[in-house]
Amino acid sequence: MHAMDIMRMESGFVHWGHDISPEENQFEAGLSFAISFKKNINFIGRDTLEKIKDKKVEKSLKILTLENSKPGEPLLLHDEPIYHNNKIVGRTTSGCFSFNFNKNISYGYINSGMTSDQIDNSNFEIEVEKKKYRATVLKKPLNSKNIFTL
């Protein structure tokens, strides 16, 4: 079970109930590639998505890695605070240690006081057990054989 969770995180796949839920919309979760407004097909939620598609997202799901990673140090799970300039700007949704890439991986929502480029080029910290660890946002999954990225 844990091996499959690690592989899905390495590949950029999200988990329903952790990384995506009714609290987030498809644009915040990086799933806009799965939506097409070109076809004249009505689907559940289409009207709402059309209303918000051009609005600025309030938060963005990102993949982060920790510097100086070791297995289980720290033990990333979910709901750890994400900091930028000593302010909480988000929370993690999933976490694991990737033995294939020798890194701690975490998914997390970062509140959008910043543009996507600013988020991708900024340094963050993730707090685990009252200790902060430097984190870097990945532009694509570690196992980037995927057809999409967050």
State where each predicted segment sits.
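Conserved, structured C-terminal
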Residues: M1-L150
